[in-house]
Amino acid sequence: MSTPTPSRRDFLRTLGASAVALSASRGAMASPRRPGGRPPNILVIVSDDQGYRDLGCCGGQTIRTPHLDGLAGDGVRLTNFYVTWPACTPSRGSLLTGRYPQRNGTYDMYRNEKPDYGYKYPPEEYAVTPERILGMDTREVLLPRVLKQAGYRSGIFGKWDLGQLRRFLPLQRGFDDFYGYVNTGIDYYTHERYGVPSMYRNNEPTTEDKGTYTTDLFQREALRFMQENRDRPFLCYVPFNAPHIASVLERPRPVQAPEAYIESYPKPKSKDEARRVEHMAAVTAMDDAIGELLALLEELELADNTIVVFFSDNGGSGTADNAPLRGRKGQMFEGGLRVPCMVRWPGAIPAGTVCDEFLTSMEIFPMLCNAAGVAPPDGVVLDGFDMTPVLAGKAPSPRKEMLWQRRGDRAARVENWKWVESAKGSGLFDLSTDIGEAHDLSKEQPEVLERIKARFAEWTQEMAEAEPRGPFRDY
């Protein structure tokens, strides 16, 4: 039996109500605070290319993630949570700006493609390649700069990916402390991207920890930062590179993990199983690092006044488990865009809950601004809203639509309708009954398809008319 077709009036009313709700919710509710008025600390953890079911709490049966499972048990697990792009750079840009990639200007990757074909850049050539010289428009206002209004100290430990030149680096964008790498992927031990050293401390390149596993380094630096700033509000942003494949010239590129973690899983019987074990071991190593961060919050008696957010930057790749979703990283199907997410905020969000509401990573920026008691930047259009009432179970999500574009690939979700037009496949799907996007309803629901395409065209025009941002726009 086919799903009833909404009238055009109902369809437009849905979109109008969505816009009004998004606008109104930016006023948001007051956040709970400790006695004395100290705003909550913030710990944002992002994994890299983790699958939708690569967590025990998300139904994974083969991978050990006790600390993330515990985090879900102490807070809320989001099942209907999306990122803004099916790969890393634009997704991270949206997290830190609260804006669509097409609005903030970072709507594609800053990367070189020759290494995909075995080419190693000499230093002089690498210095003028897109990966080296592109970065997020310096007019964009990032989250740490806004939080400074409330006295926050902000640190990032892990993958930056928003530009390598000094003007693009974290300290120039509002962060106070940075240790990590500046591009899309590295070797977990040499810290090189296809032979190019890529680790930085603050504004300077460093090879001080070459040979040490990156997950351990990012854990170490995040622990240091939280210790040093325990007496003031802080934003600790920990974007791990796990379980992304290592950026090495050899193929197939491995996911690197410490031998002890690999050996903790059953011995693989094939090359494919071995690659899956590497992936699982990297996730479990990251989970242990996250466990150390959460344990320190308890030790410092900060856990009750700290918001913890975890999600994957995009859908899983390689041997990641995206079931029951269709597709993976780089694709416009659910497996490239819908990701695992959980939020813990004692006093504001009930523990042990599950939220099935339609939400996105663009809701994080306004949520954290409101939690800190600071206003979003003047004159900046945000594309999200404070999702605290939704996570607390006090209100339905006002989000009714989400739109995506990656070069020639396009997709939109309106209510439970999902439209995809891409090189990997196209169709119209009813996510309320078909989360795996297996049944194309384009022929059965031509009016719905036409209306979603019309809405996408309107959104495209809206993005084109927004104040232009580099590095890709012509202005």
Functional labels for PLM-detected ranges:
Residues 2-19:
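N-terminal secretory signal peptides and thylakoid transit peptides that target proteins
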Residues 144, 225, 408-420:
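Short, surface-exposed beta-strand/loop micro-motifs that present aromatic residues
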Residues 104-143, 201:
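His/Cys-centered metal/cofactor-coordination and adjacent catalytic loops
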Residues 25-44:
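C-terminal segment of N-terminal export signals and the immediately downstream linker at the start
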Residues 36-40, 47-63, 70, 79, ...:
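Active-site-proximal cap/lid insertion segments
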Residues 72, 148:
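Anion (oxyanion) recognition and catalysis
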